[in-house]
Amino acid sequence: MSDTRKEAPDTAGTYFLTGFPGFIGKRLVEHILREEPRAHVYALVQPKHLKEAQKLAAKLKGTGGTLELLTGDIVDMHLGLSGEEYQRLCARVTHIYHLAAVFYLGVPKETAWRINVDGTRNVLELARDCEHLRRLNYFSTCHVSGDRLGVIAEDELDCGQAFRNVYEETKFHAEQRIQRAAASLPITIFRPCSVVGDSRTGEIDRFEGPYYLGILLVTSPLVMPMPLPGNGVAPLNVVPVDYVVKAVWTLSHDPRAVGRTFHLVDPNPMSARRVYERIAEQSNKKLPRFNLSARAADVMMRLPVLEKLARPQRAALGYVNHLAIYNCHNTLELLDGTGIRCPPLASYLDQLVAYVREQYRQRRERSSEVEDPLDLSPPPLEDDPSDAEPPRSR
């Protein structure tokens, strides 16, 4: 099809979203349906996640707009859709939200490349074919900055950085393709940091990365738990999922956001040590006065009692000692006056801890065999999705 955009008809938006029914994806869909009662949302769903998606779709009936599930996969030509389905999207879609990606740190490079880079290329093809496209919203990650230290600006991408894992590397290459496409497409890029549970309820579908610090503290039978890996002075930048959804929805409809990149981060993050101390206080634990070096922490993580962390999760804990400061000037500028602002972690940390504690308590009640606190994660879904494959993104 031609890349020439036709003028969008004066109707409610028609949305296409990848990464459903994952952690962020399902919340974004619900937000769209509530905020725009006349909207029609197409959600791309992998076959293995169709049942879960159908259950969620049934719960969302009556919330406002309409949700239509399309079975497919971003790695396939035309996203695995039939010719009729693909043509329907091309004729109707006004907004695309591309969330699906593999984020699991231990994923083989070929798999990560196929999903994160080739999958993004396929979504770009759809965007070029959409006759009424108003916006392609791409979910990247702050971690495309790799091993860079210091202040990192939103308009920076390729600064000669090295990458610590294939997730960072493949998301970097995917964003490069997105940025090149922005010359001819109305694109907005979002780079969230680590997304945690809802700031009001603490609810989250997955426990990974920084959450493992909290889980080890909350559920540890030891009065004095494991010391914090490293000195803990680096900022632990996390954002609640409800903030991410509201910010993305608002910015994706702001014409000033076209062609720009937005760090979805806490503008004033707490240090990793302070977060660890606050969680310890809530768990009635006394922290050791000494720190572990990164190497000593890695050795301790290999002990049998902690082996459930596994190599990918040990790698994730390395982020707590990474002194990167993500500037969010663009985000603050465009959200100014909207009432949407990332809440400080201190204001909702108690809810996150309480949710972890309650999930662990319920898990222990369901099975007396569960002795390992790190066994409490539910099976991964798809926008963080996948099981046979490693989890896919947001």
Language-model features: locations:
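N-terminal Rossmann NAD(P)H-binding glycine-rich loop of SDR-like oxidoreductase domains
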Residues: 8-38
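Amphipathic terminal alpha-helices
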Residues: 14, 36-39, 327-394
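Conserved Rossmann-fold NAD(P)-dependent oxidoreductase catalytic core, especially the SDR/UDP-sugar
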Residues: 97-99, 106-114, 118-166, 188
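Active-site Tyr-X1-5-Lys
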Residues: 125, 149, 161-193, 198
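Terminal hydrophobic/aromatic helix or amphipathic segment near a protein terminus
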Residues: 272-322, 342-345, 361-371
